[in-house]
Amino acid sequence: MQTSWQWHRRLLHNLATPEKSVLRLNLDETSIVLNHDGQKGVVTSSADNKVVLVNKKSKQRGTLTHVVLVCDDNEIQPLLPQMIIGNEHVLRVRDMNELAPDIPKNVFLVRAKSSWITVPLLIVLFEMLRKSLDAKNVTKHPVLLMDACPVHLHAHVWRAARRQRIYLCFVPASLTWLVQPLDVAIIRKLKAFVRAHYKRTQVQHATACVDLVHVVRILVRAIAKNSAGPDMEQCFRRLRLCCLWHWSQITDLVLLCKSWLSQHCRSR
């Protein structure tokens, strides 16, 4: 934790100048399930002619991966590239063609062998991020916060970040809940939005089977709501204060232990 925190502070101190400020970013991947049938309350019954869901579970299984990217500037947030990755056995070519008119310019729907993030896809995302910032003449220095998963730590990813003038900072796996805005404030709300609108689609279509195309459309709406929703700057600032508080508590505890050990050794 100490190394990560010092690294982050060093980057902010070295990059921030009167001419150029720092753009703090956070990237993380989250799994989006394609059905929510396992929860209570899906099947309903009624004596009148209202819409009723039948007791039939969806045969659709699998997940999509949403690569989420947020920053501490609400004006830049809608420009940031977002990626949705689907396994080629789940996300079919005809689904891609049907969804093409509904996908915003900053959202990239990817059909790949695996639904998880890979080094080549992350490099492409860095390239798209740089193009998005340059297209709007964003002069801030991007500092990207990521967890320490093997894909993020790959040498090719580091080189790609250097080419695109993106400064990387990593968070230990056990501390993402404390440091990353995505883990604390964003992803949970995004998944809740998808789950709620999945249920709403079931009611509207009078079926428990919601196809992949509808799930992707719901996710795209969730991404748009996320871009226009919470104050990202406040999220980053609150986490920074929280980290400072926790770090001060840890420092005080270490000093207290040292003092106790010193007194204990002298008494013996």
What are the roles of these predicted feature ranges?
Residues 1-266:
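Phosphate-facing sequence motifs and polybasic nucleic-acid/acidic-lipid-binding regions
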